[in-house]
From Swiss-Prot:
A cellular-component GO term for this protein: spliceosomal complex
Nucleus among keywords: yes
EC number, as in UniProt: 3.6.4.13
Function: Pre-mRNA processing factor involved in disassembly of spliceosomes after the release of mature mRNA.
Reactions it catalyzes: ATP + H2O = ADP + phosphate + H(+)
InterPro entries, alphabetized: DNA/RNA_helicase_DEAH_CS, HA2_WH, Helicase-assoc_dom, Helicase_ATP-bd, Helicase_C-like, P-loop_NTPase
Location in or out of the cell: Nucleus
GO BP annotations listed: mRNA processing; RNA splicing
Protein name, per record: Putative pre-mRNA-splicing factor ATP-dependent RNA helicase PRP1
Family listed: Belongs to the DEAD box helicase family. DEAH subfamily. DDX15/PRP43 sub-subfamily.
Gene: PRP1
Enzyme type, top EC level: hydrolase
GO molecular function, one term: RNA binding
CDD domains on file: SF2_C_RHA (cd18791)
Amino acid sequence: IKYMTDGMLLREGMTDPLLERYGVILLDEAHERTVATDILMGLLKEVEKQRSDLKLVVMSATLDAGKFQHYFDNAPLMTVPGRTHPVEIFYTPEPERDYLEAAIRTVVQIHMCEEVEGDVLLFLTGQEEIEEACKRIKREVDNLGPEVGDLKTIPLYSTLPPAMQQRIFEHAPPNKANGAIGRKVVVSTNIAETSLTIDGVVFVIDPGFAKQKVYNPRIRVESLLVSPISKASAQQRVGRAGRTRPGKCFRLYTEKAYDSEMQDNTYPEILRSNLGTVVLQLKKLGIDDLVHFDFMDPPAPETLMRALELLNYLGALDDSGDLTRLGSMMAEFPLDPQLAKMVIASTDYSCSNEILSVTAMLSVPQCFLRPNEAKKLADEAKMRFAHIDGDHLTLLNVYHAFKQNNEDPQWCYDNFIQYRSLKSADSVRQQLARIMDRFALQRTSTNFNSKDYYL
């Protein structure tokens, strides 16, 4: 059995179009509809026509089964009953004007009024919101007086250091002598929807929002916007409350909003992304007729045209829309097309080692930490790495300092640097260097003391 990401399987398809080495392929969490999953489903549908021995299993806890069955030519459906406990769902009678305020109020009410022991999981949209909520919840509970049980607030988001993320598995504070219940409240982004299970959670608070990537093809900008979640995501959140015993879910929106305003499933990523990488991968896979490629949800023609224009401008496609030698090399790099072109072109400017480091740093989460309790110290530490010519050279300074200090986690801690991001960047850099070596692209650096260095 081989476990891999959908992106890895897609890369294998570039060298082995029929995926001959596999007899059974399972696509899990298909409801998330990532770009790689959507392309894979289109490819595997074609592969199945040529390989009668291949078995394809598409799995999900909250799948729009009918749509997937129809896409795969009325494939059979197998349902496995879940073993979750019953969860009582509550809605607000009126729409909430300020979901953050309502969420904090709900946490405090649960802690004060619920007579059942159990922890609380609150979903919010991002780091700033989560830190603000943790601070305000703690302040409000501390002001309630000694007769109320202790409440431990724990933030959870992807850029949090691993040691801090492990806090979600800590036990709740003990009950007081007067019987007041001690609880913990985990305030998380939507990574707690499917990625992990937190034992002890009985109460879930769902404001109904998450950050989603949105792409505007006209101005060619991707941004993260706070958007309403889908019914599928809402059901995933409900399921978090019934993992170990019966629970309650407090939805901070009306039942009418759930029934008539929410989409059934999350808007597929392929419909809200820059398709430059997608088009490059499909061209590398030998698929030239992009308009008729069997996407489950075809992207807008304008988005496809913008991607083709970009790749032509970068030299990855010729004027006929065919893949060039440069484009074929770019497709091998697991990067956005602009970054892939930059890495390949860096050999002509004798700076490929530096560009590898910058590209690796751009490919991992934010490396600068700025904890609430030490913002001034963190800003001062960041300024020590700052470069007058901008963020890219600032990131290069951080990477160089990390290597010069022997990748020391303590050095990262002292300088408010995210150790995990730097280790990831180091791995990405090694991977990119191996791809460069495969294409015999020379890795060079200009001597810092050379008079040509700043030309």
